[in-house]
């Protein structure tokens, strides 16, 4: 978009430039979800207000909800395993009501395959390939050992459905406060200061 429409960025705009990692996109949230009313709720609804929504956890790939409680037909998908569920386990303790995290999962899959590769070369980012342990009859799969998470976007949705977008700087600070890793920030500031030798009139 920027290459096609460079004029959309003005000299006094605040911009953020971050590094691109090769992984798979994930989303984790604690948001208001439709809940299935039990018969006693329906009876109580005749006498008083019974909310039909409640805060609950959701996790997904870029397009598919992976939480089986909200997507009954969900499959293991492209990778044949729920790598998004593994990432969500890491992030769930940091989710407060209304918060949604957008991130890239990098490294290895629970099955031992690379999340992303090209020309036979895995983009492992220094993480170890999970190996079958004959003693426990399992393949250990640990965060920051076999896979990593890079948060690049955060939103907060209030009870009225209004969405607040964290700034790029707020994303960096939030991750730092929680001990999580954001995408690497290469530049943050005024567009005109990125290349100070170029006049804004040119």
Name these PLM-found stretches.
Residues 1-202:
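Core nucleotide-handling region used for phosphoryl-transfer chemistry
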């Amino acid at each position: 978009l920027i290459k096609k429409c460079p004029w959309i960025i003005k000299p006094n705009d605040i911009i953020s430039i971050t590094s691109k990692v090769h992984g798979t996109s994930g989303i984790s949230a604690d948001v208001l979800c439709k809940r299935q009313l039990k018969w006693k709720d329906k009876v109580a609804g005749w006498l008083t207000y019974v909310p039909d929504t409640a805060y609950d956890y959701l996790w997904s790939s870029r397009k598919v909800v992976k939480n089986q409680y909200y997507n009954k037909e969900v499959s293991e998908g492209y990778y044949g395993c729920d790598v998004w569920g593994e990432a969500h386990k890491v992030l769930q303790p940091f989710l407060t009501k209304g918060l949604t995290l957008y991130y890239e999962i990098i490294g290895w899959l629970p099955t031992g395959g690379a999340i992303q590769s090209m020309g036979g070369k895995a983009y492992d980012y220094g993480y170890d390939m999970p190996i079958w342990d004959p003693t426990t009859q399992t393949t250990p799969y640990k965060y920051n050992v076999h896979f990593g998470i890079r948060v690049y976007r955060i939103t907060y949705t209030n009870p009225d459905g209004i969405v607040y977008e964290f700034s790029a700087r707020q994303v960096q600070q939030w991750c730092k406060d929680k001990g999580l890793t954001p995408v690497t920030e290469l530049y943050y500031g005024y567009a005109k200061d990125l290349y100070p030798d170029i006049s804004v009139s040119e």
